[in-house]
């Protein structure tokens, strides 16, 4: 007779295997789907080399990594702030990256290359992260640090609104496209941004022990000997980096970091040894499928992926909000 622990372990393995298969199928669909359907047997043809390897593959890898980063960031923040409604934009890091990108667009008059825009977005996210770490060094409680992040996000949102109000029509088109999120401009030139995500993603997936302690609450984590101040600073910095790079790649994409971790917890994946890799797989799968919808929904244009995730995620967010209020 299997013990309860072994049964749970087998169930967790089955979940990870199912999520891995789902991600591989979503990856395959993303590479095949488009204006022209290209089956795997045609990938070695000249048409396949152009459309699949040069156009679709870099975009698909970017979608996969950003989806994984946003979902893991959501799981980290929900454990760190003991709030199931926490998500990557909550601390203002996404808006900070947006301010950096908008400043680059306006000051560069739309002439800066994509790599420079990416660096400015990362710089904006890291500046907000440094401000948050400054607050954290004052040993604020988690709730106060959360409120500080919300306030910073509101300030950054106001700055973006002012910038859009005073921008020209050409700049406004680029800014509005960024605010809705999209992978349309991603190619192999952004591979350095993709590589910048991988080490942090892998490192966080290996930090299940402190994450499990943090999920028990501040008091319990201290009693178990966890250096709370150190881990809070490190996790805030790692989240800021992942969100900044994600914004630099694709703009503002919401609800992935909110919905994916919560759904996996409802499915019984509460141990961060399973939850963190599960979030990476499920977040990548969800964003890959949303990207396919964004590409195929309209014949003559491509939907912003942020619109797709918001349309699908908003009802779930309302449901979570009502459930949390009971």
Swiss-Prot record:
<comment type="similarity">
    <text>Belongs to the binding-protein-dependent transport system permease family. FecCD subfamily.</text>
</comment>
<dbReference type="GO" id="GO:0005886">
    <property type="term" value="C:plasma membrane"/>
</dbReference>
<keyword id="KW-1133">Transmembrane helix</keyword>
<keyword id="KW-0812">Transmembrane</keyword>
<dbReference type="InterPro" id="IPR000522">
    <property type="entry name" value="ABC_transptr_permease_BtuC"/>
</dbReference>
<feature type="transmembrane region" description="Helical">
    <location>
        <begin position="274"/>
        <end position="294"/>
    </location>
</feature>
<feature type="transmembrane region" description="Helical">
    <location>
        <begin position="146"/>
        <end position="166"/>
    </location>
</feature>
<feature type="transmembrane region" description="Helical">
    <location>
        <begin position="88"/>
        <end position="108"/>
    </location>
</feature>
<feature type="transmembrane region" description="Helical">
    <location>
        <begin position="112"/>
        <end position="132"/>
    </location>
</feature>
<feature type="transmembrane region" description="Helical">
    <location>
        <begin position="61"/>
        <end position="81"/>
    </location>
</feature>
<feature type="transmembrane region" description="Helical">
    <location>
        <begin position="240"/>
        <end position="260"/>
    </location>
</feature>
<keyword id="KW-0813">Transport</keyword>
<protein>
    <recommendedName>
        <fullName>Vitamin B12 import system permease protein BtuC</fullName>
    </recommendedName>
</protein>
<dbReference type="Pfam" id="PF01032">
    <property type="entry name" value="FecCD"/>
</dbReference>
<dbReference type="InterPro" id="IPR037294">
    <property type="entry name" value="ABC_BtuC-like"/>
</dbReference>
<feature type="transmembrane region" description="Helical">
    <location>
        <begin position="15"/>
        <end position="35"/>
    </location>
</feature>
<comment type="function">
    <text>Part of the ABC transporter complex BtuCDF involved in vitamin B12 import. Involved in the translocation of the substrate across the membrane.</text>
</comment>
<keyword id="KW-0997">Cell inner membrane</keyword>
<dbReference type="GO" id="GO:0090482">
    <property type="term" value="F:vitamin transmembrane transporter activity"/>
</dbReference>
<keyword id="KW-1003">Cell membrane</keyword>
<dbReference type="InterPro" id="IPR023691">
    <property type="entry name" value="ABC_transptr_BtuC"/>
</dbReference>
<feature type="transmembrane region" description="Helical">
    <location>
        <begin position="184"/>
        <end position="204"/>
    </location>
</feature>
<keyword id="KW-0472">Membrane</keyword>
<feature type="transmembrane region" description="Helical">
    <location>
        <begin position="302"/>
        <end position="322"/>
    </location>
</feature>
<dbReference type="GO" id="GO:0015889">
    <property type="term" value="P:cobalamin transport"/>
</dbReference>
<comment type="subunit">
    <text>The complex is composed of two ATP-binding proteins (BtuD), two transmembrane proteins (BtuC) and a solute-binding protein (BtuF).</text>
</comment>
């Amino acid at each position: 007779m299997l013990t309860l622990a072994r049964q749970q372990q087998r169930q967790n393995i089955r979940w990870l295997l199912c999520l891995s298969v789902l991600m591989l199928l979503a990856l395959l669909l993303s590479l095949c789907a488009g204006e022209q359907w290209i089956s795997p047997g045609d990938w070695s043809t000249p048409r396949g080399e152009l459309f699949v390897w040069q156009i679709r593959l870099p975009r698909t890898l970017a979608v996969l990594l950003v989806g994984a980063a946003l979902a893991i960031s959501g799981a980290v923040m929900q454990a760190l702030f003991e709030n199931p409604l926490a998500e990557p934009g909550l601390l203002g890091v996404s808006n900070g990256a947006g301010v950096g990108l908008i400043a680059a667009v306006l000051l560069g008059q739309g002439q800066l290359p994509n790599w420079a825009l990416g660096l400015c977005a990362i710089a904006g996210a890291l500046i907000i992260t440094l401000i948050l770490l400054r607050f954290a060094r004052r040993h604020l409680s988690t709730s106060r640090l959360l409120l500080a992040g919300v306030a910073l996000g509101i300030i950054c949102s106001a700055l973006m609104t002012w910038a859009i109000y005073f921008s020209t029509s050409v700049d406004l088109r680029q800014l509005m496209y960024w605010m809705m999120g999209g992978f349309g401009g991603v190619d192999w030139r952004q591979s350095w941004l993709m590589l910048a995500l991988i080490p942090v993603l892998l490192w966080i997936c290996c930090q299940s022990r402190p994450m499990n302690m943090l999920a028990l609450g501040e008091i319990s984590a201290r009693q178990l000997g966890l250096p709370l101040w150190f881990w809070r600073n490190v996790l805030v910095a790692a989240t800021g980096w992942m969100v900044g790079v994600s914004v630099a790649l694709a703009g503002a994409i919401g609800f992935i970091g909110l919905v994916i971790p919560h759904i996996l917890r409802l499915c019984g994946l509460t141990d961060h040894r399973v939850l963190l890799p599960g979030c990476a797989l499920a977040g990548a799968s969800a964003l890959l499928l949303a990207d396919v919808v964004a590409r195929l929904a309209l014949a003559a244009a491509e939907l912003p992926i942020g619109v797709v995730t918001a349309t699908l995620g908003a009802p779930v967010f309302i449901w979570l909000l009502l459930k949390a209020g009971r």
